[in-house]
Amino acid sequence: MEDRIPVADLQHSAGSLAAIAFHNIEHCTQKTSSAILGYYHLPHIGSEHSSSDNADEAAKYTKAFIKGRKVAVKVANLINQGKTIHPVPLRVTGSGLVGGPPCEGHARLIEGITWFEKTQFHHQSLRPEGNHSTASHYLHFSTPLAQIIPGAEGRTQPMDVVQDITLISGMCLWASRIIQSSMPRGQRLDVSRLLSSKITLYEVEYLARAVPVIADLAAALSANNPYGPTPLNIRLDIPSFHYYHSLEERLRDGCCTFPEALQWMHAVEKRHHQLSRVFCRLIDHELSRRWVGTPHRRKLDVQVSPLADLVFQLICDSLANSVLPDVDDILQIVQTEDTTWVRFYSLVPENEKVTDFRALSYLFYVYQVLRPALEQTHVNTTEGDEATSKLLISVDDAFERRIYSRSQKLLKKLRASLPASAAVPHLLEVYLCRRIFINSNETGSNLYLDDPSPEPFVLRLCQGLAPEGKQELVRAQDRHNTRPETIKLDAFDVVEGLYGSHIAEVLKDLFAEVGLGA
C-alpha cells in the first residue's frame, strides 16, 4: 500500500498573505519536474540520483545517496539486532529523497546535499489508530565512523555492548521574525511581541514532525529487549539565556533600559517553560501509544537543558542590579557548580574558548549533546570484561548540523582520554526531512527563518493528498467559516493537513494547557 506523506510549499513574500500548497511528497519530487527545487524522489536503489545536466552537481547527489544509504542499512542492522524476518522494529526501504538547497550558498554550505531514507517503524499497535502498525518517515542517518558502535556490528546481539542510550533533541522559540521584531535595530525594545499567546507554525510543525520520530526510535530500541531493557534517557535542549547576546547589543547601544531587558528575558523564560512542558507531554503521549500492550511501560528520564537555568539566573541577577553581565564571571561560577561542564570545557581548544555571550550560547548547544557522555556511570573493573559503549542519538533539523559536527570532534577527543574500563560514547546523528518548504525551496530557506506567523495562511492547492487529508482541510474551512476559494488556515490546520487530525488535536490541547493557541 502506498504511503501518502504530504509536504507543504509555503509561498510567501513581503506585503502578501502567505499561501500554502499541499503535495504528495513522492509525486511532487519526480526527477523531471520536481515542485521542490533541489529535491528528487528515488523509488528504488537503482534509480538515477539527479536530473541535473551538470556533472559536478550530479556527482554530489550520487555521493550523498551512497553515503546515506550505507549508514541507513547499518542503523537498521544495529537496532534490529541483526534480525531480518519481517516485521522488524525498523525497516529501511531503499527509496527516499535526495536533495538540499538548490544552489551554492550559505544554506548549502550548512546543510549540503542529503539522502533521506524512507524509514518505517513497526509497532504492535498505534493507539488510537490501532490498525496502523507502521509509521513512515524520511530520515538521514550520519556518523563519522566506519561503524556506528565499533565492535558491536557483526555480533549476534550488537546492542549488548551498549550500557545506556540517550536520545537528544531540541527546538528554538517562536520564529526568527518574531524575535527580531521585538528588538528592531536602532529602536526601543517591543516586549509585547514576545508576550502574545499565539503559537508559531514553526513551533507546532517541528513538534509534530520530531516527536513521533523520537518515540518511534525509543520504541524500536526497546522492542528486542522488553524485559531487561538498556537504560534509555531523553535530553531536550530548548534555549533560554541563549538569546541574551542579541539583547546585550541593544543594552550597549542604549536602545533599552535594564528593567526593559529584564522583562524581555522573563518573556523568553516563560516561552521556554511553555515549550518545554508541551515537548515533554507530547513525548509521553506518543510513547504511551507505542508501548500499549507491552509487558511493562518504561519510565524514561527526561531532562530539559541542564545547567542552562543557572546561566539564565546569573544573567537576570546582573540585569536586576543594573549591571551588564560579565561572561567571565558567569563561566567561573559554572565551573564551580558543575563537574560535567569542567570536563567538557577541558576538551575545548584554547582558541575556541568562550570570549562573549554569543560564543557561550553556541558552545552550550554542543555541551548539551556531550553532557550524557560526560556524566559518571559504572565502568568495568573486572579483568576480561568487554568494553561497553554509551549510544547518543540526536534527532534534529539539518540546518543545526554544525552543532553535531562540533560535538563529534569533541567526542573523539573525549574517547581518546578515557581509561580502558570506561564506557565509550558514540553519537549517531538523525536528521529530519523538511515537510514545509519555503517558496518551492528556491533559496533553501527554512521555516524558522521565514515563518510568517502569526499571520494566517491561504490554502492554494491540495493535490496529491489522501482523501482523509482533504477532509481535514474541509473541516478547517468549516471551522473558520470561509469560502472555498479563500480557505484560511491557522498553524494547527496546516499540521493537520501534514500529519493528521490526531496529533493536531493533541497539540492544540497541550498548548492550551500552557496558555497558548492559534
Curated annotation (Swiss-Prot):
It is an enzyme of class 6 (ligase). It catalyses: L-tyrosyl-tRNA(Tyr) + L-arginyl-tRNA(Arg) = cyclo(L-arginyl-L-tyrosyl) + tRNA(Tyr) + tRNA(Arg) + H(+). It comes from the Eukaryota. Its EC number is 6.3.2.-. A motif (Conserved DDXXE motif) lies at residues 396-400. The keyword Ligase applies. Keywords: Ligase. Pathway: Secondary metabolite biosynthesis. GO terms for molecular function: ligase activity. Belongs to the arginine-containing cyclodipeptide synthase family. The conserved DDXXE motif is essential for catalytic activity. Arginine-containing cyclodipeptide synthase; part of the ank cluster that mediates the biosynthesis of NK13650 C, a highly modified cyclo-arginine-tyrosine dipeptide connected to homoserine, citrate and aspartate. Within the pathway, ankA acts as the scaffold-generating enzyme and is responsible for formation of the cyclo-Arg-Tyr diketopiperazine (cRY) from L-arginyl-tRNA(Arg) and L-tyrosyl-tRNA(Tyr). The ankA product cRY is desaturated by the cytochrome P450 monooxygenase ankB to yield a dehydro-cyclodipeptide intermediate. This is Arginine-containing cyclodipeptide synthase ankA. It comes from Aspergillus thermomutatus. The lineage of its organism: Eukaryota, Fungi, Dikarya, Ascomycota, Pezizomycotina.
